[in-house]
Amino acid sequence: MIVGYRSTIITLSHPKLGNGKTISSNAIFQRSCRVRCSHSTTSSMNGFEDARDRIRESFGKLELSPSSYDTAWVAMVPSRHSLNEPCFPQCLDWIIENQREDGSWGLNPTHPLLLKDSLSSTLACLLALTKWRVGDEQIKRGLGFIETYGWAVDNKDQISPLGFEVIFSSMIKSAEKLDLNLPLNLHLVNLVKCKRDSTIKRNVEYMGEGVGELCDWKEMIKLHQRQNGSLFDSPATTAAALIYHQHDQKCYQYLNSIFQQHKNWVPTMYPTKVHSLLCLVDTLQNLGVHRHFKSEIKKALDEIYRLWQQKNEQIFSNVTHCAMAFRLLRMSYYDVSSDELAEFVDEEHFFATNGKYKSHVEILELHKASQLAIDHEKDDILDKINNWTRAFMEQKLLNNGFIDRMSKKEVELALRKFYTTSHLAENRRYIKSYEENNFKILKAAYRSPNINNKDLLAFSIHDFELCQAQHREELQQLKRWFEDYRLDQLGLAERYIHASYLFGVTVIPEPELSDARLMYAKYVMLLTIVDDHFESFASKDECFNIIELVERWDDYASVGYKSEKVKVFFSVFYKSIEELATIAEIKQGRSVKNHLINLWLELMKLMLMERVEWCSGKTIPSIEEYLYVTSITFCAKLIPLSTQYFLGIKISKDLLESDEICGLWNCSGRVMRILNDLQDSKREQKEVSINLVTLLMKSMSEEEAIMKIKEILEMNRRELLKMVLVQKKGSQLPQLCKDIFWRTSKWAHFTYSQTDGYRIAEEMKNHIDEVFYKPLNH
């Protein structure tokens, strides 16, 4: 039986394929389908190509937006020759030239939730101007902004920069020393100071500028200075080290190196190459347009992998970078060890060390990385990280600990586990939530122009719409095939057109593999018909008759038909397989028909054995026998192996019968079968059907059986992911051929991730609508 194919039926109306048709809901898309096809206007396609070229160029323009906050701190560094002169006067010029109309400084354009960021940046700029006695008019306007918006200092609805209470309170003290009278409510000032006192007891080296003279800067530099001369890659903290401890050549060299790239301002983090590359690759994948930039992404990840192998501090001194690099590299088939994440296994140790104030972003990225365990023993580090990060984020959600909606949404998605989500639906949601003015926040808010821009947004929208057009065209082709072969006379309703094509897009999203996708959908429908006949529609003698007809394929006429039902069935089945075998022969340059037929024959014989031997109670299979047989009858072997011939890759029969392929279909089949058994165990126990739960309950309790089955499931899921991601020495199997098996299991995980049938039906109805029909601007 096809995994989850008929467990829930939903109604979906569409003029293209008939109104009020019902379709099977249990299916999942593994990742996005993107297509380039002819467009109505040349100018539109030219714009599409131009945008793609500009996005490609962005791989070489890896920078962040200017940080008023950090630039102000650098501006406050005194000259090495005179304490009465600025070391970097160009920063003062930038501050004077970049005050906003309302008198503030900060991210431009700003955001309604960034008032604390604007207050922090504005106060830092006022300190710099006051210290060097310049910009009287700018100071006056800046104080006006603080007077108007000072109420936001303690507002819980505003997004706080990292260490805001510590740093802002410290800057208030600095203003007092400079005789800069701040128009702030005294009660608010005292509140901030109280929060500073409680926060400063923690490990706050990253916000050292907020500790000021109380910090042991000599010890700080000794412990935390990086090879590039910075403290935490933070221009502000490094500048503070020179303000309070003026004797470090490497700190000066670091700040000077920034001005080799930026004339008179600094970003909130530098260097930015690793950060920008990781975020750009991740964003392209989330938008579902990464296939357009394969060579650029490969080059970027090769560079990240080189730095990973060198244990470069740009990766390993930053929790977010380390976790993102591990995730992106492992999922892109690079050999990376989870040992590099060992220092994050303990929650208490994590929050007490590393010198840097922790944000939910770091914990979110650690959690994403922790889901990529592929070995029970070697990846126990990931299991430990997964346990505490999951508990931490669940508690945050429970306490409503996220101010902005996007952060909360990201966490909710991450907690669903990446292998139980639909990437195609997530691509759409990511595009809809994508904003060219999106920002992130450290000690100051910042943007990445090469990651958030109108080109990438327009490109992603256009690409998604082209993909939808191809989906609709292929659905029409499938409908014509359904009608030409009169599948309805075999009991297959037209509603299965959507459902079967959904499976095809799930497993084969690549737009150029249309033949493979349509073949997959046709196989799903044929398999449904076969399953119906061998399960209940046909008698035992009719099933034997069908098997004999398939065995004597080229001489089937000499066999004869037991009934008209068998004749109608075999006529449709024969024509369908002959058609698909012809296409496969053209693609492979040789006949593969016998192999395709033998795969069907094996499936049918085992289906009949289940019915005659197992369901009748004549034979009770062992656990291993049960898993082996049901993996095959669950289509884990037939469809993925047959699909290989349609992928545009020449592949030998020997390779398809290799131990590697056997391991892949066996693991994916076990995953699908176990997921099904866990969900259907209650129903099948009442029906006295054989499943893994009932087999294990002969020697243990139901609770123990379910626990044991979940262990087997997790072991096989990890083993499958390992076989797909880890490059086996001497393997001749193309990567795409292996990916098919993981995508199939991912679809099963999504199908069985919900136990509420109504919820599945509603979610899948929306899923089909959004993927195939609904415009992005809907």
From Swiss-Prot:
Entry's Gene Ontology molecular function annotations: magnesium ion binding; terpene synthase activity
The alphabetized UniProt keywords are: Chloroplast, Lyase, Magnesium, Metal-binding, Plastid, Transit peptide
Q: Could you say which residues bind Mg(2+) 3 here? A: N676, E684
Q: Which residues form a coiled coil?
A: none
Q: Where in the cell is it found?
A: Plastid, Chloroplast
Q: Identify the residues that bind Mg(2+) 2.
A: D531
Give the UniProt entry's GO cellular component terms.
chloroplast
Q: Which residues bind Mg(2+) 1?
A: D531
Has UniProt tagged this entry with the keyword Lipoprotein?
Answer: no
**Catalytic activity line of the entry:** neryl diphosphate = beta-phellandrene + diphosphate
Q: What is its EC number?
A: 4.2.3.51
Top-level division of the source organism's lineage: Eukaryota
Major place of localization?
Answer: plastid
Enzyme class, UniProt record, top EC level: lyase
Instruction: Kindly state a single biological-process term from the GO annotations of this entry.
Output: gibberellin biosynthetic process
Q: Name the tissues where it is expressed.
A: Trichomes.
In the record's own words, the domains note is: The Asp-Asp-Xaa-Xaa-Asp/Glu (DDXXD/E) motif is important for the catalytic activity, presumably through binding to Mg(2+).
Reported function: Monoterpene synthase catalyzing the production of beta-phellandrene from neryl diphosphate. Also produces lower amounts of delta-2-carene, alpha-phellandrene and limonene. When incubated in vitro with geranyl diphosphate, catalyzes the formation of acyclic myrcene and ocimene as major products in addition to beta-phellandrene.
What protein name is recorded for this chain?
Beta-phellandrene synthase (neryl-diphosphate-cyclizing), chloroplastic
